[in-house]
From Swiss-Prot:
It is found in: Virion membrane. This is Packaging protein P22. It is a single-pass membrane protein. Keywords: Capsid inner membrane protein, Membrane, Transmembrane, Transmembrane helix, Viral genome packaging, Viral release from host cell, Virion. Together with P22, forms the internal part of the portal complex embeded in the virion internal membrane and which plays critical roles in genome packaging and genome ejection. Both proteins multimerize as a single ring-shaped heterdodecamer arranged around a central channel and interact with the P6/P9 external part of the portal. Its main location: virion. Heterodimer of P20 and P22; further multimerizes as hexamers of heterodimers. Part of the dodecameric portal complex that is composed of the packaging efficiency factor P6, the DNA packaging ATPase P9, and the internal heterododecamer P20/P22 which spans the virion inner membrane. The chain crosses the membrane at residues 22-42. The lineage of its organism: Viruses, Varidnaviria, Bamfordvirae, Preplasmiviricota, Tectiliviricetes. GO terms for cellular component: membrane; viral inner membrane; virion membrane.
Length: 47
């Protein structure tokens, strides 16, 4: 649960150039996961 709350915290903060590497990795990871999930949903709907 801690990871989810951290991600929510990072996503609610305005983006800064000095954002920590962990924040960026979590943000990028979140986007990748969202894209994969979206593709799975689309595929499920089409079938």
């Amino acid at each position: 649960m801690q990871l989810i709350t951290d991600m929510a915290e990072w996503s609610s903060k305005p983006f800064r150039p000095d954002m920590s590497l962990t924040g960026w990795l979590a943000f990028v990871g979140l986007i990748i996961v969202a894209i994969i999930l979206w593709q799975q949903i689309i595929r499920f709907i089409i079938e």
